[in-house]
Amino acid sequence: MTTNTVTLQTAHIVSLGDIEEAKASIKPFIRRTPLIKSMYLSQNITKGNVYLKLENMQFTGSFKFRGASNKINHLSDEQKAKGIIGASAGNHAQGVALTAKLLGIDATIVMPETAPIAKQNATKGYGAKVILKGKNFNETRLYMEELAKENGMTIVHPYDDKFVMAGQGTIGLEILDDIWNVNTVIVPVGGGGLIAGIATALKSFNPSIHIIGVQAENVHGMAESFYKRALTEHREDSTIADGCDVKVPGEKTYEVVKHLVDEFILVSEEEIEHAMQDLMQRAKIITEGAGALPTAAILSGKIDKKWLEGKNVVALVSGGNVDLTRVSGVIEHGLNIADTSKGVVG
């Protein structure tokens, strides 16, 4: 592969070379996740070939392990000795914690007070020190930055970092290895590290691949920034897609997204829940809200058919770290809707 004129615009931030280097760097740590075809989404919904990239089966249950391990691998011995710190709603936290454990590095993770219990416990289980601070990610991040400065620790940013983006971009290389003629790729978006990395990998190979970012209607800072062509804050309420609850995207990720992503789709909380239910019932996949965003976009009918019908489509299931109480609530809600529908129809 060679970098083309499209990706040259963002090569100073993250390049195909960075991603290929990341692939070699993290190979001993990560799992190459499967890509499976969804017969229901293919035959019943899109009339195309829809594949699910299962990053919920990655170590730590999320794609975040890729970026975290690549970043930490590139730290100096002095930085590793002083310890690392990160701010995360949970998935990045686990990626940092596990990598730190494997490399024998002290790790501190600051999480929002609303972080799911499952993600808190998993992070602690990998040996990291967990501090709960802040009602949203931005408050958490500010506190984390204070601690880092006070203690001389190196920050492992969850998305706005070249090495993190490159690590996430290895997913794009795996997609191309499995489906070289992919037409459309649908990616969940929070701070933008995942879609920036994947878009760089894919567009370096074929600029005509259509890349769609998906965010929740309640929190969509990147989509707002994309269409206003300037960094913009947006958060109306919390979202079941807590892994993407980032109201202000990264400066670096935004620059990549601005040039390489083609469009954004916004989905409601109900549409996200429906997608989680559908993935459980039809594909036997348990996913967190963020991981269901691409499927929600497909099921919602908001994506133009020309990007789906007769096309090879990949929808990324980015993670599966969800509390069982949340899963049971989603199932119960779905059953209640079904019962109500039966009552109306019957």
From Swiss-Prot:
It is an enzyme of class 4 (lyase). The modification N6-(pyridoxal phosphate)lysine is found at residue 64. Gene3D superfamilies: 3.40.50.1100. InterPro entries: Ser/Thr_Dehydratase, Ser/Thr_deHydtase_PyrdxlP-BS, Thr_deHydtase_catblc, TrpB-like_PALP, TrpB-like_PALP_sf. AMP binds at residues 59-60, 94, 125-126, 321. Its EC number is 4.3.1.19. Signal peptide: none annotated. It catalyses: L-threonine = 2-oxobutanoate + NH4(+). Its cofactor is pyridoxal 5'-phosphate. GO terms for molecular function: L-serine ammonia-lyase activity; nucleotide binding; pyridoxal phosphate binding; threonine deaminase activity. One of its GO terms (biological process) is L-serine catabolic process. Each protein molecule can bind up to four molecules of AMP, which act as an allosteric activator to the enzyme. Pathway: Amino-acid degradation; L-threonine degradation via propanoate pathway; propanoate from L-threonine: step 1/4. It comes from the Bacteria. Keywords: Allosteric enzyme, Lyase, Nucleotide-binding, Pyridoxal phosphate. Catalyzes the anaerobic formation of alpha-ketobutyrate and ammonia from threonine in a two-step reaction. The first step involved a dehydration of threonine and a production of enamine intermediates (aminocrotonate), which tautomerizes to its imine form (iminobutyrate). Both intermediates are unstable and short-lived. The second step is the nonenzymatic hydrolysis of the enamine/imine intermediates to form 2-ketobutyrate and free ammonia. In the low water environment of the cell, the second step is accelerated by RidA. In the native structure, TdcB is in a dimeric form, whereas in the TdcB-AMP complex, it exists in a tetrameric form (dimer of dimers). PANTHER family: L-THREONINE DEHYDRATASE CATABOLIC TDCB (PTHR48078:SF6), THREONINE DEHYDRATASE, MITOCHONDRIAL-RELATED (PTHR48078). Belongs to the serine/threonine dehydratase family. This is L-threonine dehydratase catabolic TdcB. It comes from Staphylococcus aureus (strain N315). The lineage of its organism: Bacteria, Bacillati, Bacillota, Bacilli, Bacillales.
